Regions:
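Short, flexible/disordered intra-domain loops and linkers
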Residues: 14-19, 46-58, 143-151
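Catalytic pocket-lining loop regions of alpha/beta-barrel enzymes
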Residues: 104-106, 118-220
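Active-site gating/metal-coordination segments in enzymes
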Residues: 54-142
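Divalent metal-dependent hydrolysis catalytic cores, especially in the metallo-beta-lactamase
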Residues: 25-52, 78-83, 104-109
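Mid-to-C-terminal alpha-helical segments outside catalytic/metal-binding sites
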Residues: 1-9, 14-38, 209, 213-220, ...
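Active-site environment of divalent metal-dependent phosphoester hydrolases
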Residues: 10-13, 45-48, 86-90, 114-115, ...
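Conserved, mostly hydrophobic/aromatic
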Residues: 6, 30, 67, 99, ...
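Active-site neighborhood of phospho(di)ester-bond hydrolases with catalytic His/Asp-centered motifs
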Residues: 2-5, 39-41, 81-82, 108, ...
Length: 266
């Protein structure tokens, strides 16, 4: 089994006219490399009618409903994260409840608020209530602010994780750019923070450093927007790990932190 813990899809209310082909191409590429399940989110309108990193409540509702529709259309291949904006706290909690009722298995937070902000506490409590992991967009060692987003770094995510030790948090895209050593140092001794290996970065020594920092038990495989570099990292991990260790990264760790029966038995 191979679980992509960080995937994305599009809808008709996003800037891409080729959104259907993009969605189909992800599934085709996943078949080629052996992905069993794509655990995915849709980030509002991807900037069409509200900012990607500050999506409106209406855009999130539509995106999450379309994510559930994809789940229903591909029940053996797709699972959904509920995407929420913590600035709309009560709405976010309601969306999580709707998502759980519709079979979604995690929470997706992007860059609408720093991860150590108290506004995220009700979301973390809702995740704990429903046994959902939280995938949080992270800029590896933020050096400056970017327009239209409040990007978080690993230190800020760990502050949230310390406040909610019963919630499993996923540090998104270690290979997404920036100082991943800073991130690994921050998460080393925070056992409820897992690291997803997605992102286009494939720096020499990154995977070895990740294994040294958090061990194979807290690594999750993922791709983010494209599959090619995720596949490259998986092939390299196969040269570093035993078969059982590789299976942990491929699917066993994900199966342990997502809700029971979220994935087919293996």
């Amino acid at each position: 089994m191979l679980i992509d813990t960080h995937a994305h899809f599009y809808t008709d209310r996003t800037p891409r006219a080729d959104w259907q082909e993009r969605n189909a191409s992800r599934l085709r590429a996943g078949e080629r490399v052996g992905i069993t399940i794509h655990v995915a989110s849709i980030l509002g309108s991807w900037g069409l009618t509200s900012p990607t990193y500050f999506p409106s409540a209406a855009d999130l509702e539509y995106a999450n409903e379309q994510m559930r529709a994809l789940q229903r259309a591909h029940p053996h291949r797709i699972r959904g994260y509920v995407a929420v904006n913590p600035n709309y706290t009560r709405h976010a909690v309601r969306e999580i409840e709707r998502g759980v009722a519709g079979g979604m298995i995690g929470v997706k937070l992007a860059a609408s608020r720093r991860s150590d902000d108290p506004l995220l506490d009700p979301i973390a409590r809702a995740a704990a209530e429903h046994g959902l992991p939280v995938l949080h967009h992270i800029w590896q060692h933020r050096r400056r602010d970017f327009p239209g987003q409040e990007a978080s770094d690993a230190v800020e995510l760990c502050a949230l994780a310390h406040r909610h030790p019963g919630v499993r948090f996923i540090l998104a895209h270690l290979g997404g750019g920036g100082d991943w050593l800073h991130s690994l140092h921050a998460v080393r001794d925070v056992p409820n923070v897992y690291v997803d290996l997605s992102g286009s970065g494939v720096d020499g020594g990154m995977l070895e450093a990740c294994l040294a920092a958090v061990g194979v038990e807290r690594l999750l495989w993922g791709c983010d927007l494209t599959i090619d570099t995720g596949w490259a990292k998986l092939r390299y991990l196969a040269t570093l790990l035993s078969a059982d260790e590789l299976h942990r990264v491929q699917w066993k760790n994900a199966a342990a932190i997502f809700p029971r029966n979220a994935f087919p038995p293996c």
